[in-house]
């Protein structure tokens, strides 16, 4: 039966995709967090493009938290559902205050607005932490 040997059945997929670099072009956990939030229901290519000027101006969570939502919104107008995502990013910056406070465990990540289990597992995987489940993206 297929489900009895699920680990064996997944090995070809794991072998095929193991070691592939994530399509979001980030340099640190802060950038990854922001990009993962923005990429929901949007293309990684779009997020890679629109975040370049944003990260030039806002290099960390502290710089966002010292700003206001009206200042950061124009950077995200080409992102699907940008009003909601912009609010989440601003609220996360206010909550965490610094990049050092970005959680790297599933429970604390999913407690953040805009971060569900899939997004949390992407962040965990990319920061070399233990993940739960298989991360699948269909776009």
Predicted feature locations:
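Catalytic DNA-binding helix-loop module of base-excision-repair DNA glycosylases/AP lyases
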Residues: 33, 37-38, 89-91, 102-139
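N-terminal polyanion-binding entry modules of DNA glycosylases/AP lyases
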Residues: 1-102, 106
């Amino acid at each position: 039966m297929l489900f009895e040997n699920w680990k064996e059945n997944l090995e070809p997929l794991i072998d095929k995709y193991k070691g592939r670099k994530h399509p979001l072009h980030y340099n640190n956990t802060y950038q990854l967090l922001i990009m993962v939030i923005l990429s929901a229901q949007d293309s990684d290519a779009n997020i890679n493009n629109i975040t370049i000027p944003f990260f030039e101006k806002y290099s960390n969570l502290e710089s966002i938290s010292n700003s206001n939502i009206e200042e950061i919104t124009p950077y995200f107008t080409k992102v699907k559902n940008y009003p909601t995502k912009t609010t989440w990013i601003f609220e996360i910056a206010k909550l965490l205050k610094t990049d050092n406070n970005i959680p790297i465990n599933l429970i604390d990540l999913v407690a953040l607005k805009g971060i569900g289990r899939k997004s949390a597992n992407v962040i965990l995987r990319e920061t070399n932490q233990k993940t739960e489940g298989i991360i699948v993206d269909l776009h």
